[in-house]
């Protein structure tokens, strides 16, 4: 039964193994990679050089070819939760006068060169005259399925943000990961530049890597990985059942019931709540991660616009008998949802 309604609503890879792994310690202690040389590094589609850049030793990565990106996997890393710190810099190699935002970042929980979570930055967007470009200075992605284009189109402004950055300048990054949440900090700030509540990657642990793009020189130095006690999580929870759900956003919130069924990776069911009763749900399931859609009806008593048909999109993780994620009523409201399975 519906509850009351309140006012609502890829990757071409470069794999680099750092020779500084001799300084890496066990996963229970901090692992430090100064990246002072290229001894033992293994590269694909990239040229690597040990350099001194802006006064500090670093590894420079340049991606071979006219288009593509690359990831540098640090050996001996098996990261789940904790902190990753690094210093990065970027120098564009495009002709003078060509606008280039730049792309350089840190990947984590990497299974291989195409499956990973990642934060990257676009220093050239930080001081752009167009505010829209400024809003695209910091980015989260999850390969191979959730690139920047898909995330921006499906969840505008959720997985990218502004940030104080500059070309040809060392930037300190800090990534904090706890379960399905990750935060990115810039240059020692106590406030995160981007918070991702609901990481979309397929794996709960994996390697840490350095990421670069074509038309630039990317520099990396002083990577430090500090593990923390891992949150107890397990992928693969089923979505089938009756779910009591709460949701909300800037335009308000409410409650609903979802009755869901799953056959392999296909999900079907119904939604009953403020946006309609018995509305047909379709979607997908991937190892506990779900994407659900249905056609709803914006309520007549809402103060947030005229009534009419709406498209609703939910995405999130099932963890045992609980679930949470993001909800979008396209063009009307965006927010979060959480649910419990009725037993």
Locate predicted features.
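Central antiparallel beta-sheet cores of small beta-barrel/beta-sandwich binding domains
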Residues: 233-343
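Intrinsic disorder/low-complexity segments enriched in polar/charged and small flexible residues
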Residues: 10, 25-27, 150, 157, ...
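N-terminal secretory signal peptides that target proteins for export/translocation
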Residues: 1-7
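Basic side chains
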Residues: 3, 109, 224, 262, ...
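Extracellular glycan-recognition regions
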Residues: 25-238
């Amino acid at each position: 039964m519906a509850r009351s309604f309140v006012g609502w609503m890829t990757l071409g890879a470069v794999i680099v193994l750092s020779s500084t792994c001799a300084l890496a310690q066990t996963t229970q202690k901090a692992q430090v990679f100064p990246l002072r040389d290229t001894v033992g590094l293994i590269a694909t589609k990239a040229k690597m050089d040990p350099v001194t850049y802006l006064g500090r030793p670093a590894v420079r990565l340049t991606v071979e070819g006219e288009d593509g990106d690359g990831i540098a996997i640090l050996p001996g890393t098996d990261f789940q939760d904790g902190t990753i710190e690094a210093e990065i810099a970027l120098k564009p190699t495009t002709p003078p006068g060509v606008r280039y935002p730049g792309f350089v970042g840190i990947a984590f929980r990497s299974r291989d060169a195409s499956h990973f979570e990642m934060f990257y930055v676009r220093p050239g967007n930080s001081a752009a005259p167009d505010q829209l470009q400024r809003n695209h200075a910091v980015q989260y992605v999850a390969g191979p399925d959730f690139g920047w284009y898909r995330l921006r189109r499906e969840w505008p402004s959720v997985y990218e943000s502004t940030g104080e950055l500059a070309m040809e300048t060392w930037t300190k990054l800090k990534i904090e990961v706890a379960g399905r949440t990750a935060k990115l900090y810039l240059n020692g700030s106590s406030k995160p530049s981007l918070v991702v509540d609901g990481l979309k990657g397929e794996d709960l642990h994996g390697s840490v890597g350095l990421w670069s793009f074509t038309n630039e020189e990317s520099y990396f130095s002083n990577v430090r990985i500090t593990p923390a006690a891992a949150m107890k999580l397990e992928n693969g929870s089923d979505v089938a059942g009756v779910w009591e759900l709460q949701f909300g956003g800037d335009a308000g919130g409410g409650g609903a019931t979802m009755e869901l069924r799953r056959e392999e990776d296909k999900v079907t069911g119904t939604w009953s709540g403020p946006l309609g009763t018995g509305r047909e749900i379709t979607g997908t399931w991937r190892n506990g991660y779900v994407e659900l859609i249905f056609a709803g009806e914006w309520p007549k008593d809402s103060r947030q616009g005229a009534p009419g048909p709406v498209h609703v999109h939910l995405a999130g993780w099932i963890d045992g008998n609980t679930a949470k994620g993001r909800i979008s009523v396209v063009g009307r409201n965006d927010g979060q949802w959480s649910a419990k399975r009725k037993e």
